[in-house]
């Protein structure tokens, strides 16, 4: 919703809806950006025993400029070792309808992401984007991987 309000405002031609879109966009944040930038919270008291990596979702990174905030939060989770994923900012291959229109290309992109995740020897891969989590989690499950897939909110809720 926030991304839509932020990026699609120019397509709203009436002043009333445009004002409402701006008002919504001003109060809508990606979770880690809200915690770190707005609330100045870097430690929520979470605990997760294991090695964790972060996948940068294309929209979060490129559209919203969210990169360091989730890493900061993860690094403050007790008993967690953060491992930077090789090419963490590379697409997972989902891209909305991209994976349907170009399934072979999508699968090849995902193969590279999965190889990077498996190579870094983590217990969990975390992201802030549900479609990335479904794409990555689906493949990890199909290959029988023990790597857990988690949304950032799920990791931060661990105690």
Which positions does each model-derived feature cover?
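Iron-sulfur cluster-binding electron-transfer modules in prokaryotic oxidoreductases
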Residues: 1-159
């Amino acid at each position: 919703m926030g991304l839509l309000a932020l990026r699609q405002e120019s397509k709203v031609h009436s002043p009333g809806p445009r004002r409402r879109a701006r008002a919504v966009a001003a109060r809508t944040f990606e979770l880690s950006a809200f915690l770190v930038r707005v609330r100045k919270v870097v430690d929520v008291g979470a605990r997760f025993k294991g090695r964790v990596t972060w996948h940068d979702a294309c929209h979060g990174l490129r559209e919203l400029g969210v990169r360091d905030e989730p890493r900061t939060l993860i690094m403050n989770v007790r008993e967690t070792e953060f491992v930077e994923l090789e090419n963490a900012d590379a697409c997972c291959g989902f891209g909305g309808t991209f994976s349907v229109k170009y399934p072979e290309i999508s699968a090849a992109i995902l193969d590279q992401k999965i190889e990077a995740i498996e190579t870094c020897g983590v217990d969990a891969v975390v992201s802030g984007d549900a479609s990335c989590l479904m794409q990555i989690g689906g493949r990890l499950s199909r290959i029988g991987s023990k790597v857990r897939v988690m949304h950032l909110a799920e990791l931060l809720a661990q105690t």
